[in-house]
Amino acid sequence: MRHFLTLNDFSKAEILEILSLADKIKKETKNKKYEPYLKNQTLAMIFEKSSTRTRVSFETGIYQLGGQGLFLSSRDIQLGRGEPIKDTARVISSMVDMAMLRVYKQSDLVEFAKFSSVPVINGLSDDLHPVQLMADYMTIKEIANGETIAYIGDGNNMSNSWLMLASILGLELHIATPKGYEPNKNFINIAKENAKISGAKILLTHNPKEAIEGANVVATDTWISMGQEDEKERKVKDFESFCVNKNLMSLACKDAILLHCLPAYRGYEVSDKVFESHARDIFLEAENRLHAQKGIMVWLDAHRND
């Protein structure tokens, strides 16, 4: 049985296979053709961290695939508090067909999956956001005119996930963060090893201008992640030169697209003018969460016996 916890668990061929499936299902959806790939299946959606896009996309997705979603908030379930995670996993997985977790600790996801009898999907953790990267690359394949990617901002779960995707697929990735905010060293090392096989080109820099020059795709994310509100004043000062504004964006390719996983804080990681001029890109990316995740769920269902 396969889980979707990190992109590093998948080969290039498997990632592209999932995205091809997602594209097929998206075309069917646009034609109002809803194939019941997951008829009568229940997806448990466990949220330690709240999210508009994650809940709407997964709940709508499983419904359009012929199943139903079961929403469990932090008020309904306390992972590891009271009942051990392994017991929670055993109980929930005995009653549902698949589980999606949006949590703080990646280790909680790994523990849940270890004892789950059904496929488990990482809806987000503090370390990684793999479902978002599947939507992002789906968007790149649809509308970008190249695959040189610049990530500007915090070395958070998004930068870690970009390292995984680019290093597996053999892409060129430039990451610019302020000093002290680099991506997790563990993921940097994994990416370097992957790149030896895939031929990926990865640049880590503290200069956003160096990173963005010649990029076909510019990606950014909030500087203050959920639970880091007390760091806002310090981070705003440290990230001052990392706002994707008109001047910085002008260094990218003329037809570069802009990606942001949302919510966006305009005037901080991206200027309002740049955001609005690339709204088409960003909201297509948001929509593609629905389609990419449907592809993931259908693929996992087909590989239950692996």
Curated annotation (Swiss-Prot):
The keyword Amino-acid biosynthesis applies. GO terms for molecular function: amino acid binding; ornithine carbamoyltransferase activity. It is an enzyme of class 2 (transferase). GO terms for cellular component: cytoplasm. L-ornithine binds at residues 157, 221, 225-226. Pathway: Amino-acid biosynthesis; L-arginine biosynthesis; L-arginine from L-ornithine and carbamoyl phosphate: step 1/3. Pfam families: OTCace, OTCace_N. Its main location: cytoplasm. Reversibly catalyzes the transfer of the carbamoyl group from carbamoyl phosphate (CP) to the N(epsilon) atom of ornithine (ORN) to produce L-citrulline. This is Ornithine carbamoyltransferase. It comes from Campylobacter hominis (strain ATCC BAA-381 / DSM 21671 / CCUG 45161 / LMG 19568 / NCTC 13146 / CH001A). The lineage of its organism: Bacteria, Pseudomonadati, Campylobacterota, Epsilonproteobacteria, Campylobacterales. The gene is argF.
